[in-house]
Regions:
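Single conserved hydrophobic/aromatic residue that forms the stacking wall/gate
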Residues: 1-6, 11, 336
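N-terminal alpha-helical interaction blocks
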Residues: 7-8, 12-25
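Residues immediately within or flanking Cys/His clusters that coordinate Zn2+
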Residues: 22-24, 42, 333-334
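Polyanion/phosphate-binding surface patch
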Residues: 25, 29-31, 134
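Short, cysteine/histidine-rich loop/knuckle motifs that typically chelate Zn2+
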Residues: 28-29, 46-50
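Short functional micro-motifs and their immediate structural scaffolds
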Residues: 32-35, 53
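Short Cys/His-rich "knuckle" micro-motifs
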Residues: 37-40, 55-58
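Catalytic residues for metal-mediated phosphoryl-transfer on nucleic acids/nucleotides
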Residues: 57-136, 140-338
Length: 339
């Protein structure tokens, strides 16, 4: 509602202005005084993501193995966008359920790998132009533990056929969507309003079932360090970063975006300030919604024992966090020195 929109924009507009307090430093030698304005710490603020990203990525180093990793992207047909946007908490969660069930169940099938694997799922809801484009990025460990607790992988080849992933993911997501509709758990606002009618909703299901859902699997990462760099790039990303904003006037904003209809070349787009804010706010996640989730060997209940066992089987050294127990000031100093 308008209250949420106002509060979200007000918070970010006040970041590092003094509205959230200040820290004052005084030099013991010369008495020079420095004033540092506090940040808003909002997870959608472009100025506040670097610090939590560095701490999170550094902690993830303890979970990384010297083993193959793959990047799989799960997308849904654009026809579902209106109903997903009207039911973000339920239907974003359904994306995680469908993606995780697909990966875990197929990996456990002896026809493919026959193991318990580990992976991280990250929700992004935007395209390059800040359009609404919900999709899941999954960083998938390319091996796992079989029923005898032995390590098994498929080398540098991804162990699951893309067509099988596609059909399985489509079936699981559509089944949960249908169940939510039948249980009267969905809301129908704006362009989703027609789907409150059973026959219109049924037509939507038929259209989406008839489409090929094309998950995307990238080449394997080149070692554990490249996985870490990739996690840093994707995990705490927001709809648009400051460097992409090229110009602003009293009424317009110009920003750069990739043109995927023209070989992914960058182009500049100018839209009204109101439209820019509208697009940005589409990607504010529901309150307390967890965007980064861990599964299988990497889940909280498993990783302490099972990842240690995997590390021993593979002969991997355990990375010790460089930032654990450091203060915010020490963390900032460390990351700046490393850069």
């Amino acid at each position: 509602g308008s209250g949420l929109v106002g509060s979200e924009m007000c918070i970010r507009d006040s970041c590092k202005t003094g509205a959230f307090g200040v820290n004052v430093s005084v030099c013991e030698d010369c008495g020079c005084i420095s004033v540092h304005y506090n940040s808003c710490r909002d997870r959608c603020c472009p100025m506040c993501q670097e610090f939590p990203k560095e701490k999170w990525v550094d902690a993830r180093r303890e979970d990384i193995l010297d083993a193959p990793y793959f990047h799989v992207v799960f997308t849904v047909p654009e026809e579902l966008n209106p109903i997903i946007y009207s039911n973000q908490k339920f239907l974003y969660s359904a994306l995680y359920h469908a993606a995780s069930d697909t990966l875990s169940e197929l990996a456990a099938d002896c026809k493919y790998l026959g193991t318990d694997i580990g992976y991280i799922c990250i929700l992004h809801t935007w395209g390059s132009t800040m359009n609404f484009h919900p999709h899941i990025h999954a960083i998938v460990l390319g091996g796992g533990l079989d029923v005898k607790n032995h390590w098994k992988d498929n080398g540098k080849d991804f162990f699951l056929p893309i067509k099988v992933i596609s059909k399985t993911f489509r079936g699981k997501y559509m089944a949960e969507l249908k169940q939510l509709w039948e249980n009267d758990r969905l809301e129908f606002h704006g362009s989703a309003a027609p789907y409150k009618n059973y026959y219109t909703f049924k037509e939507l299901l038929n259209t989406c079932y008839a489409k090929e859902w094309i998950p995307y699997c990238k080449k394997p990462f080149d070692g554990a360090e490249s996985v870490i760099r990739y996690l840093g790039k994707y995990t705490h990303r927001i709809a648009i970063s400051n460097y992409r904003i090229k110009d602003m006037t009293e009424s317009t904003v110009t920003f750069s975006a990739k043109d995927y209809k023209n070989q992914g070349l960058w182009k500049e787009i100018t839209i009204s300030g109101e439209e820019f804010i509208r697009r940005f706010l589409m990607h504010v996640p529901p309150k307390r919604f967890v965007r980064i989730r861990h599964y299988g060997l990497l889940s909280c209940r498993n990783k302490s024992k099972k990842m240690t066992h995997c590390r021993n089987l593979l002969g991997c050294k355990k990375y010790i966090s460089a930032l654990k127990n450091r203060s915010a000031t020490e963390t900032v100093s460390y990351t700046h020195l490393r850069a």
